[in-house]
Amino acid sequence: MSEPQPQLEIPTRAPAATSADDTILPFQVEALDLRGRVVRFGPAIDTILSRHNYPVPVAKLLGEAIVLTVLLGSTLKFEGRFILQTQSDGPVRMLVIDYTTPGKVRACARFDAARVAAAMAAGAAAPGTLLGHGHLAMTIDQGPDTARYQGIVALEGKDLEHAAHEYFLRSEQIPTRVRLAVAEELRAEIDGARHHWRAGGLLLQFLPQSPERARQPDLDPGDVPEGMEFQPQPEDDAWVQGRSLVATVEDLELLDPDVSAEQLLYRLFHEPGVRVFRSRDLHAQCSCSRAGVERMLRSFPQDDRDHMVENGKITVTCEFCNSTYVFAPMDVREPEPSQPDPG
């Protein structure tokens, strides 16, 4: 799938007055060989996180993982699914996020409630602490008859931004910076004030076109002869400028509904000039269905299905969207094989 054609260029066009929620906005800074994405989440992420009664730190961590998944998945030129999954020894054992092109998202978390409560009581519920040590896997699934591609990076007690930087540094050799922000917004409504989740993110990558620009400083090979020192190639000035600008982005700028993505990009890159492309919409949408759950149940041996019966019915709850499907045991029983006609 080819990169969309430019829709507008800043600063030749006035930025949008307000933020467009639930969108992905690609951009390019040609003068510095930089490309990236800005993601703004409003109702979609509120829908996903509000479906579950997660503790606030768990919901915030899952929100960050959702933003990271969309930032990474939307850079790939394919039709299919991008899945981000963590498995670790921290209080939050697993995060699973599905991004299906062009913009459907679902997500869930598994966690130890007692350990999360203890971490919150001790004031030690930072994302890196909740994750602990383990790994983060990113899988590209383009559908039947295609091979899956998977990239893995270690989780080392640090946050998801750090994990993303390490992955691109060591696996893709692409200088990358990621900023993630998630928070609750207190909003007045007819029946009283209510908390709503908001999230935002920024991805910036250095993809030089000119040969004189170094793409990535060399990593220490670990086998430098004794008596010699490894001399890494210095970072390109364009990348130093880009990552330094991203480091100035505050959480509020990624979350504020009164600051559009275009305004944020203009603030960061108005001197070299920034071009934005057509935005894409994001939706909270699960792929589960009654028919799909029924097929899944029929795939189990009959003995397993018999053990699923409670109070005369089989109940299945989707971990992603919390939808519940109830079946009578006979609904998912395989038909008895027909007997041959004795005549």
Where are the predicted features?
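Polar low-complexity intrinsically disordered regions
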Residues: M1-Q7, P337-P342
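Interaction interfaces in information-processing and related assembly proteins
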Residues: E3-R278
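Cys/His-clustered metal-coordination modules, chiefly Zn-binding fingers
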Residues: R243-G343
